[in-house]
Amino acid sequence: MSNAKHSPDLLFEVSWEVCNKVGGIHTVISTKAQTVTRKFADRYVLLGPDLSHEGVNPEFEEDPNLLKAWRQSLYNEGIRVRVGRWKIKGEPTVVLVDFSSLIPRKDEILKSLWESYHVDSISGQWDYIEPVLFGWAAGVVIASYVETFGTPTEKAVAHFHEWMTAAGGLYLRKHAPYIATVFTTHATVMGRCIAGNRLPLYNDLPKFNADELARQFNVTAKHSIEKMAAAYHDAFLTVSDITANECKYLLGREPDGVTPNGFENDFVWAGEEYYAKRDEARRAMISVAEACLGEKFTGDPLIVGTSGRYEFRNKGIDVFIESLKQLAASDRLRREVLAYITVPAGNRGPRLDLQAHLADPSKPIDAGQYRHSTHYLENATWDPIVNALKNSNLTDPGSKVKVIFVPTRSEERR
């Protein structure tokens, strides 16, 4: 095998989190976009899901005149796309793909994945089918783009992140094999399930039967497409050595390489701007907490926080809250602590009473609302964070450790 390095002439990157912040992959892609765009310019194209039915997308700026003829040709084939720029540094070209036209064809597409790759979709529910249709549509769009704008001598590479986009790479392997495919998993489906169910993931990794456990945890479809993606993409990558070992045993293929996540040097502000932003953020966070809790901080609180996907155990939210409880119980604690938990959770929007009070402090706070949340929670009774805080010293009036839960957006966007 040749070790020669080749740079693609056309580079596509596909993720459910392009212009759609859900978790860390959004950060991974958005913070490298400036560097990639500097190298490839408009030969670098990002693809994400068109979720315009959920409201205006604040991260996307559409350009109705960009690639107009090509968009029309795709529309004639039954796929609608919007083309524009991602409003981040580098302003990369983005194609948002409306995959709704594929819904009537879902059985045909799932059948094709089974016949070509033995992807077992039979138990997959909508949270599986929806991203599979998006991934498939993204594959169709990439093939059309290369056919329209590429030349026979140009090298095209399509990079797919996570199982949610894997159908795109599998589509290209069959229908446009001249486009090289790369699949990156940031965390395996089964790894999340095993750890989330309190099984010793890393101690017993070689002993697990991933396919059998997938059936037990009812994630056969997601595990199956991830496993086949690892097997059938031209290159298989992951982001850490520990996840690479996970892939070896749970997906049956060792990754071809490990690409650690990186950030631009200007990922955070510097100098005076940093301190100004920091002070502004502190004031806002303290004001929101005081309004929610109906208590004033007596000094200068230490602000800590945790964020990420709402995986109570895997993301260490349980450990974070337990640590706060122990801190609150310590007689050595002298300084007040304000803890923010910002994770996506089902909600009906920000509290109106809180917004009104922050705009006009004479407006009262609704005493009937859950005081540790900034939003109206959908299922507060069953919420793990709410239940972990319930009847603990973290909810005691006058506790030196105060907790605010910010359900940043609905989990429905995955």
What annotation goes with each model-predicted range?
Residues M1-R414:
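Catalytic cores of nucleotide-sugar-dependent glycosyltransferases that transfer UDP/GDP/TDP-activated
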